[in-house]
Protein backbone atom coordinates (compact mmCIF):
# COMPACT_ATOMS: atom_id res chain seq x y z
CA UNK A 1 0.00 0.00 0.00
CA UNK A 2 1.34 3.41 -1.01
CA UNK A 3 0.43 6.27 1.32
CA UNK A 4 0.26 9.63 -0.48
CA UNK A 5 -0.20 12.74 1.66
CA UNK A 6 -1.41 16.10 0.41
CA UNK A 7 -0.90 19.35 2.30
CA UNK A 8 -3.01 22.23 1.03
CA UNK A 9 -1.93 25.67 2.25
CA UNK A 10 -3.97 28.49 0.80
CA UNK A 11 -5.47 27.77 -2.60
CA UNK A 12 -4.49 27.31 -6.21
CA UNK A 13 -6.85 26.34 -8.99
CA UNK A 14 -5.21 22.91 -8.96
CA UNK A 15 -5.85 22.54 -5.22
CA UNK A 16 -9.46 21.63 -5.96
CA UNK A 17 -8.67 18.21 -7.44
CA UNK A 18 -5.01 17.34 -6.89
CA UNK A 19 -5.78 14.69 -4.26
CA UNK A 20 -8.38 13.04 -6.52
CA UNK A 21 -6.62 12.66 -9.85
CA UNK A 22 -4.88 9.35 -9.12
CA UNK A 23 -8.12 7.58 -8.16
CA UNK A 24 -10.88 9.29 -10.14
CA UNK A 25 -13.59 6.66 -9.55
CA UNK A 26 -12.43 5.59 -6.06
CA UNK A 27 -11.68 2.06 -7.28
CA UNK A 28 -7.87 2.00 -7.39
CA UNK A 29 -6.16 -0.56 -5.19
CA UNK A 30 -2.77 -0.20 -3.54
CA UNK A 31 -3.00 3.52 -2.81
CA UNK A 32 -4.29 5.48 0.17
CA UNK A 33 -4.64 9.26 0.22
CA UNK A 34 -5.00 11.66 3.13
CA UNK A 35 -5.23 15.46 3.07
CA UNK A 36 -4.17 18.12 5.58
CA UNK A 37 -5.61 21.53 4.78
CA UNK A 38 -5.05 24.94 6.33
CA UNK A 39 -7.90 26.71 4.55
CA UNK A 40 -7.22 30.02 2.86
CA UNK A 41 -4.33 30.96 5.16
CA UNK A 42 -0.78 29.90 4.35
CA UNK A 43 1.53 31.49 6.92
CA UNK A 44 4.30 30.09 9.14
CA UNK A 45 1.78 29.22 11.87
CA UNK A 46 -0.18 27.05 9.45
CA UNK A 47 3.07 25.46 8.29
CA UNK A 48 3.94 24.53 11.86
CA UNK A 49 0.54 22.88 12.29
CA UNK A 50 1.32 20.45 9.45
CA UNK A 51 3.82 18.71 11.74
CA UNK A 52 0.95 16.68 13.18
CA UNK A 53 0.35 15.13 9.75
CA UNK A 54 3.62 13.22 10.07
CA UNK A 55 1.84 10.73 12.30
CA UNK A 56 0.17 9.24 9.23
CA UNK A 57 3.56 8.15 7.81
CA UNK A 58 3.09 9.11 4.17
CA UNK A 59 5.50 7.53 1.70
CA UNK A 60 5.68 10.89 -0.02
CA UNK A 61 3.97 14.24 0.43
CA UNK A 62 2.67 16.82 -2.04
CA UNK A 63 2.53 20.38 -0.72
CA UNK A 64 0.38 22.67 -2.86
CA UNK A 65 0.29 26.40 -2.19
CA UNK A 66 0.64 29.72 -3.97
CA UNK A 67 4.13 31.24 -4.14
CA UNK A 68 6.55 28.58 -2.98
CA UNK A 69 9.02 31.29 -1.95
CA UNK A 70 6.58 32.86 0.55
CA UNK A 71 7.33 32.56 4.30
CA UNK A 72 4.61 29.97 4.96
CA UNK A 73 5.68 27.50 2.31
CA UNK A 74 9.33 28.09 3.16
CA UNK A 75 8.51 27.10 6.74
CA UNK A 76 6.57 24.07 5.51
CA UNK A 77 9.58 22.85 3.55
CA UNK A 78 11.62 22.95 6.73
CA UNK A 79 8.99 20.84 8.49
CA UNK A 80 8.98 18.25 5.70
CA UNK A 81 12.66 18.33 4.74
CA UNK A 82 13.24 14.69 5.74
CA UNK A 83 10.20 13.27 3.93
CA UNK A 84 10.07 12.84 0.13
CA UNK A 85 8.18 15.97 -0.89
CA UNK A 86 6.89 17.50 -4.11
CA UNK A 87 6.03 21.21 -4.11
CA UNK A 88 3.24 22.25 -6.48
CA UNK A 89 2.96 26.02 -6.82
CA UNK A 90 2.58 28.91 -9.24
CA UNK A 91 6.12 30.15 -8.52
CA UNK A 92 9.00 30.80 -8.28
CA UNK A 93 9.55 31.16 -12.01
CA UNK A 94 13.27 32.01 -11.79
CA UNK A 95 15.55 29.11 -12.63
CA UNK A 96 17.93 29.78 -9.72
CA UNK A 97 15.13 29.53 -7.16
CA UNK A 98 13.86 26.27 -8.66
CA UNK A 99 17.36 24.82 -8.66
CA UNK A 100 17.63 25.64 -4.95
CA UNK A 101 14.56 23.45 -4.31
CA UNK A 102 16.19 20.59 -6.17
CA UNK A 103 19.47 21.00 -4.29
CA UNK A 104 17.54 20.80 -1.02
CA UNK A 105 16.04 17.47 -2.11
CA UNK A 106 12.56 18.66 -3.05
CA UNK A 107 10.64 17.79 -6.17
CA UNK A 108 8.59 20.53 -7.75
CA UNK A 109 5.97 21.22 -10.38
CA UNK A 110 5.76 24.97 -10.96
CA UNK A 111 2.58 26.10 -12.73
CA UNK A 112 2.74 29.67 -14.10
CA UNK A 113 -0.56 28.80 -15.81
CA UNK A 114 -2.36 28.44 -12.45
CA UNK A 115 -3.54 32.04 -12.20
CA UNK A 116 -3.31 34.55 -9.37
CA UNK A 117 -6.79 35.51 -8.18
CA UNK A 118 -7.78 39.16 -7.67
CA UNK A 119 -7.66 38.85 -3.89
CA UNK A 120 -8.80 42.29 -2.76
CA UNK A 121 -11.73 42.90 -0.45
CA UNK A 122 -12.93 45.70 -2.71
CA UNK A 123 -13.49 43.15 -5.49
CA UNK A 124 -13.46 39.56 -4.30
CA UNK A 125 -16.24 37.80 -2.40
CA UNK A 126 -16.99 34.10 -2.02
CA UNK A 127 -19.04 33.97 -5.24
CA UNK A 128 -16.40 35.73 -7.34
CA UNK A 129 -13.73 33.50 -5.81
CA UNK A 130 -15.66 30.34 -6.66
CA UNK A 131 -16.44 31.47 -10.21
CA UNK A 132 -12.78 32.30 -10.85
CA UNK A 133 -11.63 28.92 -9.57
CA UNK A 134 -14.22 27.21 -11.74
CA UNK A 135 -12.84 28.99 -14.81
CA UNK A 136 -9.29 28.14 -13.79
CA UNK A 137 -10.19 24.49 -13.32
CA UNK A 138 -11.70 24.31 -16.80
CA UNK A 139 -8.40 25.43 -18.33
CA UNK A 140 -6.22 23.28 -16.07
CA UNK A 141 -8.25 20.16 -16.78
CA UNK A 142 -8.92 20.42 -20.52
CA UNK A 143 -5.56 21.88 -21.53
CA UNK A 144 -3.24 19.26 -20.07
CA UNK A 145 -2.21 20.44 -16.60
CA UNK A 146 -4.26 17.88 -14.67
CA UNK A 147 -2.91 15.02 -16.76
CA UNK A 148 0.69 16.24 -16.47
CA UNK A 149 0.46 16.26 -12.68
CA UNK A 150 -1.42 12.95 -12.55
CA UNK A 151 1.25 11.26 -14.64
CA UNK A 152 4.07 12.62 -12.49
CA UNK A 153 2.41 11.57 -9.23
CA UNK A 154 1.73 8.13 -10.69
CA UNK A 155 5.44 7.77 -11.53
CA UNK A 156 6.43 8.39 -7.91
CA UNK A 157 3.66 6.12 -6.65
CA UNK A 158 4.93 3.33 -8.91
CA UNK A 159 8.43 3.75 -7.49
CA UNK A 160 7.14 3.33 -3.94
CA UNK A 161 5.07 0.31 -4.97
CA UNK A 162 8.22 -1.28 -6.42
CA UNK A 163 9.99 -1.01 -3.07
CA UNK A 164 11.88 2.27 -3.31
CA UNK A 165 11.64 4.82 -0.51
CA UNK A 166 13.10 8.01 0.91
CA UNK A 167 16.02 9.45 -1.02
CA UNK A 168 15.80 6.59 -3.52
CA UNK A 169 12.72 8.19 -5.07
CA UNK A 170 13.15 10.21 -8.24
CA UNK A 171 10.96 13.29 -7.81
CA UNK A 172 9.78 15.54 -10.66
CA UNK A 173 11.44 18.87 -11.42
CA UNK A 174 9.09 20.53 -13.89
CA UNK A 175 8.48 24.12 -14.97
CA UNK A 176 5.11 23.70 -16.67
CA UNK A 177 4.94 26.39 -19.34
CA UNK A 178 1.90 26.43 -21.66
CA UNK A 179 3.70 24.58 -24.46
CA UNK A 180 4.65 21.74 -22.12
CA UNK A 181 1.18 21.45 -20.60
CA UNK A 182 -0.74 21.26 -23.86
CA UNK A 183 1.33 18.28 -25.03
CA UNK A 184 -0.23 16.25 -22.20
CA UNK A 185 -3.81 17.04 -23.27
CA UNK A 186 -3.93 14.52 -26.11
CA UNK A 187 -5.59 16.70 -28.74
CA UNK A 188 -6.10 15.12 -32.16
CA UNK A 189 -7.35 18.27 -33.91
CA UNK A 190 -4.72 21.02 -34.37
CA UNK A 191 -7.29 23.80 -34.01
CA UNK A 192 -8.46 22.35 -30.70
CA UNK A 193 -4.85 22.22 -29.57
CA UNK A 194 -4.32 25.82 -30.67
CA UNK A 195 -7.35 26.98 -28.68
CA UNK A 196 -6.08 25.11 -25.62
CA UNK A 197 -2.62 26.64 -25.97
CA UNK A 198 -4.19 30.08 -26.28
CA UNK A 199 -6.19 29.43 -23.11
CA UNK A 200 -3.03 28.46 -21.22
CA UNK A 201 -1.22 31.60 -22.37
CA UNK A 202 -4.20 33.68 -21.25
CA UNK A 203 -4.20 31.95 -17.86
CA UNK A 204 -0.51 32.77 -17.48
CA UNK A 205 -1.25 36.41 -18.31
CA UNK A 206 -3.88 36.67 -15.55
CA UNK A 207 -1.23 36.84 -12.83
CA UNK A 208 0.50 39.73 -14.59
CA UNK A 209 -2.79 41.64 -14.62
CA UNK A 210 -3.91 40.79 -11.10
CA UNK A 211 -0.57 41.31 -9.35
CA UNK A 212 -0.79 45.14 -9.36
CA UNK A 213 -4.39 44.96 -8.15
CA UNK A 214 -3.37 42.74 -5.25
CA UNK A 215 -0.12 44.39 -4.17
CA UNK A 216 0.48 47.78 -5.79
CA UNK A 217 -2.60 49.82 -6.63
CA UNK A 218 -4.26 52.03 -4.00
CA UNK A 219 -7.16 53.71 -5.77
CA UNK A 220 -10.35 51.66 -5.40
CA UNK A 221 -11.45 52.21 -8.99
CA UNK A 222 -8.08 51.06 -10.32
CA UNK A 223 -8.04 48.04 -8.00
CA UNK A 224 -11.51 46.91 -9.02
CA UNK A 225 -11.06 47.63 -12.73
CA UNK A 226 -7.75 45.79 -12.90
CA UNK A 227 -8.90 42.77 -10.90
CA UNK A 228 -12.10 42.56 -12.94
CA UNK A 229 -10.02 42.62 -16.13
CA UNK A 230 -7.90 39.75 -14.85
CA UNK A 231 -10.99 37.72 -14.07
CA UNK A 232 -12.47 38.47 -17.50
CA UNK A 233 -9.32 37.10 -19.11
CA UNK A 234 -9.71 33.94 -17.05
CA UNK A 235 -13.34 33.60 -18.10
CA UNK A 236 -12.42 34.00 -21.77
CA UNK A 237 -9.70 31.38 -21.38
CA UNK A 238 -12.24 28.95 -19.94
CA UNK A 239 -14.47 29.51 -22.98
CA UNK A 240 -11.56 28.69 -25.30
CA UNK A 241 -10.87 25.51 -23.34
CA UNK A 242 -14.52 24.51 -23.67
CA UNK A 243 -14.41 25.18 -27.41
CA UNK A 244 -11.28 23.01 -27.73
CA UNK A 245 -12.95 20.08 -26.02
CA UNK A 246 -16.12 20.50 -28.09
CA UNK A 247 -14.06 20.18 -31.28
CA UNK A 248 -12.62 16.90 -30.00
CA UNK A 249 -16.09 15.69 -28.98
CA UNK A 250 -17.52 16.48 -32.41
CA UNK A 251 -14.80 14.30 -33.98
CA UNK A 252 -15.14 11.57 -31.33
CA UNK A 253 -11.46 11.99 -30.47
CA UNK A 254 -11.55 12.97 -26.79
CA UNK A 255 -8.48 11.37 -25.23
CA UNK A 256 -9.23 9.65 -21.92
CA UNK A 257 -6.73 8.05 -19.58
CA UNK A 258 -8.54 6.29 -16.71
CA UNK A 259 -6.81 4.14 -14.11
CA UNK A 260 -7.20 0.38 -13.93
CA UNK A 261 -7.69 -1.12 -10.47
CA UNK A 262 -3.97 -1.80 -10.20
CA UNK A 263 -3.12 1.80 -11.11
CA UNK A 264 -2.15 1.18 -14.73
CA UNK A 265 -3.01 4.12 -16.98
CA UNK A 266 -5.49 2.90 -19.59
CA UNK A 267 -6.30 4.79 -22.79
CA UNK A 268 -9.20 5.38 -25.16
CA UNK A 269 -10.36 7.98 -27.67
CA UNK A 270 -13.66 6.73 -29.10
CA UNK A 271 -16.61 7.25 -26.76
CA UNK A 272 -17.91 3.69 -27.07
CA UNK A 273 -14.60 1.83 -26.99
CA UNK A 274 -13.26 0.08 -23.91
CA UNK A 275 -10.16 1.52 -22.21
CA UNK A 276 -7.07 -0.55 -22.99
Q: Where do the language-model regions lie?
A:
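Anaerobic metallocofactor- and corrinoid-dependent redox/one-carbon enzyme cores
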Residues: 1-58, 64-276
Amino acid sequence: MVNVGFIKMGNLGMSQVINLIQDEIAAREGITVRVFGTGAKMGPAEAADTESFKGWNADFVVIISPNAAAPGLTAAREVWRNVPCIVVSDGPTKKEAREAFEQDGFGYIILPVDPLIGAKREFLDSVEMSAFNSDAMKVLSVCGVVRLIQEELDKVTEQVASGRSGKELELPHIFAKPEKCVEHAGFANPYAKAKALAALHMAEKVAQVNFPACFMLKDIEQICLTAAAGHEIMGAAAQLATQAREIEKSNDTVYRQPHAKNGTQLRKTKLYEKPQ
